[in-house]
Amino acid sequence: MVTVITGGRIERPISVVQSHFVDFEHHVRQKVHPGLALRILSQERGEQRIEQTVKMLGLTLKDELVVRQLPDGSVLETVVAGTNLGGSIHIGFREDGTNATFVYLTVRVPAEGWKARVAPLLKVGLLLAANQTLAEDRRDLEAGNYYPKMSEVTVEPLRTRSTLAT
């Protein structure tokens, strides 16, 4: 297994960033990742199936992923079919100041067959790809291109103070 870990700060609140990382309709519509072809296969409450095609090291890699948001707010993308079967991406989040979020990615890809022979090169390619996709997400979020769906927004009741003397 080849594993890479990376991360970075995004200047948006954690709830917005977490929502962004599971909103594949937005990613497809806005072409957040130009080098990545995404297709939504199915969406059910708590789980999505995504087809992802990318070119890496001169090869076209196609995978089917199951995406779940975990109870702690992190996201787990598990490869259930394709080139990287058995691989995964875990995306974690923590607040980093008032309106910022630190995002960390852990990418795991099985290194069997030809991948075992090029594992060091694969690791470099995975790290570059992970950093690039994180930078694309950061640009999209910090440019104000993303707003969570209203169904995902928690609205606090408006508290008013009576101006009448009692």
Where are these regions (language model features)?
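Short, highly charged C-terminal tails/helix-capping segments
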Residues: 35-38, 135-166
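Short beta-strand segments that buttress and anchor functional surface loops
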Residues: 49-56, 75-82
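Hydrophobic pocket/interface hotspot
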Residues: 17-27, 50, 67, 77, ...
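Beta-strand/loop substructures that line and gate deep hydrophobic ligand-binding cavities in soluble
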Residues: 79-132, 149-150
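Beta-strand elements of well-folded, non-transmembrane domains
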Residues: 10-12, 54-58, 71, 95-97, ...
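Short, surface-exposed coil-to-beta transition loops
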Residues: 3-5, 60-64, 85-90
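A short, structured loop/turn motif at beta-sheet edges
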Residues: 11-15, 43-46, 68-73, 92-102
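Hydrophobic ligand-binding cavity/cleft-lining segments
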Residues: 1-46, 159-166
